[in-house]
Amino acid sequence: RWFTNFIERGEEFEYIGLSYYPFWHGSLDQLEFNMNDIAKRFNKDIIIAEVSMGFTMDSYQEYEKLADSERKGYATKPELVEKIDYPMTIEGQADFTKDFLNRVANVVDDHGKGFFWWEPAWIPVHGSGWATPASLKYMNDPGPCGNEWANQALFDYDGNVLPALEVIRDFRK
C-alpha cells in the first residue's frame, strides 16, 4: 500500500529498491515473485538495494582481536542457516549468487536493473564494520563491537577473492 498511496498523492519515482537476505526474507522463488509482482503492478524498475549470502560459519574472532563479550557475532545466526536453500560454503555462495543474478535479470519487462552487495569488503580486521568502538561512541551505543558481516563478504577472511565475485564479474544477461 505504501507505493500505491505514494502514487495516489502524485509523487514520482523511477526505481523501487528491495532488501533481500535469504536468512531473513525467504527463498529466491519468493523474491522472484515479489519482484515480478511489483514490476507489473507499478511498472517500475527494481534494484536489490542490499543482498548477501555467507560463505562460511567459521569463526573470525582471531582476526577481530575482540573478546567474546565485545563481539557482535554473525548477522546470520546459526539457527537462521537452516532457513537458507544454499549451504554456507564458498560453493554455496557462488551458486546462490548465480541464481540470484539470473532472477534479477529475468524480472518481467526487463525491470530488473541491478543490486548492491552488503557488504562486499568487510573482512574481519580490527576496526572493520559499522560497530567499531569509535562509531559506537559517536552513536552513544553501548555495543558490542565487531563486524557481523565478515562471513558474507566477497573476500575470505584473509582478503582473497571468492568465486562469488567472479560470478558477478562474468555474469551476462
Over which residues does each language-model region extend?
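Noncatalytic carbohydrate-binding groove/subsite architecture in carbohydrate-active enzymes
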Residues: 1-76
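Aromatic-rich peripheral "rim/lid" segments of glycoside hydrolase catalytic domains that contact
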Residues: 33, 37-40, 56-99, 103-111, ...
